[in-house]
Design a protein with these regions (language model features):
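ATP/NTP phosphate-donor binding region
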Residues: 1-79
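Structural motif
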Residues: 10, 26-28, 78-81, 102-107, ...
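Catalytic cores of large soluble enzymes that bind and process phosphate-bearing ligands
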Residues: 13, 57-60, 84, 152, ...
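Alpha-helical scaffold segments in soluble metabolic enzymes
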Residues: 20-23, 67, 71, 94, ...
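Short glycine/serine/threonine-rich phosphate/pyrophosphate-binding segments
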Residues: 21, 36-39, 62, 87-94, ...
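A short, small-residue-rich loop immediately preceding and capping a beta-strand
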Residues: 72-108
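A glycine/threonine-rich phosphate-anchoring loop and its flanking beta-alpha core
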Residues: 98-172
């Protein structure tokens, strides 16, 4: 039997990958974190001339995706950047193809692996659905240990549990 592995076209990883990656102007950055934290991350990235959407909720729904699409389709972002955990990356995975834009995924935690897969988890009518489409694959993933520095032990434990949950929740 033949097997196929699909991975992002570009994977920048390592210490300071975040700062050494070049980001397009007029990018839409989608995140779940408050501005005090996202501002620090965006400064580390060196990104300039961007739009920010920080209203993504944990375990997002298709309604969250539609809010991003309706709010930004006329602003014509050059690219969508999912910065954060699986929630922000999953919103970008679904929204970017709808807007006919490329996507850059930057995980700030570990556990979901969302930056590397063709899977997207969203709620439809209150029920979580695991979707798999090639269009959900990132055009670029940026993985930097910067986000692990100072991560509280409880967050690390939660991320390990999340990795286990992600491995099993797709089975209905």
């Amino acid at each position: 039997f033949m097997h196929t592995v699909r991975i992002p076209k570009v994977i920048n990883f390592g210490k300071n990958a975040l700062g050494e990656t070049e980001y397009p102007k007029n990018a839409l950055v989608v995140t779940t974190v408050p501005p005090a934290l996202s501002d620090k991350w965006l400064a580390k990235m060196g990104i300039q001339d961007y739009m920010l959407y920080d209203q993504v909720k944990p375990e997002p729904s298709i309604d969250d995706v539609n809010k991003v699409i309706s709010q930004f389709k006329d602003k014509n972002p050059s690219v969508l950047i999912g910065l954060g955990g699986g929630s922000s990356m999953d919103v970008v995975k679904y929204a970017a193809p709808e807007l006919k834009k490329q996507k850059i995924l930057i995980p700030t935690t570990f556990g979901t692996g969302a930056e590397m897969t063709t899977y997207c988890v969203l709620k439809f009518d209150g029920k979580k659905k695991l979707l798999r489409e090639d269009r959900f694959l990132a055009d670029m993933a940026v993985v930097d240990s910067y986000f692990m520095d100072g991560t509280p032990e409880q967050v690390i434990k939660s991320s390990v549990c999340d990795a286990c949950a992600q491995a099993t929740e797709g089975y209905d």
